[in-house]
Amino acid sequence: MRRASLSVLCMLGAFWGSVLAAPQRPNVLFIAVDDLACTLGCYGDLIAKTPHIDRLAAGGVCFERAYNQLPLCNPTRASVMTGLRPDTIKVYDLDQHFREEVPGVVTLSQQFKNRGWFTARVGKIYHYNVPASIGTDGFDDPPSWEKTVNPK
């Protein structure tokens, strides 16, 4: 009886040890910024004082090269979030929504959401009329988020 109890206790200990040692999913913070140049400390700028962004970059991924297909925020962001080129999703300007051309496309945030991550949008990801639409959902994509926050 003692051996059986000891065996069960050892198995439970091994099980809980493996559960506790299992890697946890990382937090993912996607920051989309309008008109941000590389004048940040994490990119080697000696004048800019950006300690908070620098700390985020040091603990995550700092991209060294960036490209976009069109010099406007809406087509570029729609392309990044869908993984499709602007000519595929027919978004060339600020007043077009990618769902009109590809209604069933799964966005990057939906990929995370479908795999159990909590997804939220704070501020602008796609496009809205500035300043009139600040504080609204604007040109958003509701299937992509569980929660939205619209700063004023």
What label would you give each PLM region?
Residues 2, 18-152:
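Formylglycine-dependent sulfatase
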Residues 7-16:
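Bacterial N-terminal signal peptides
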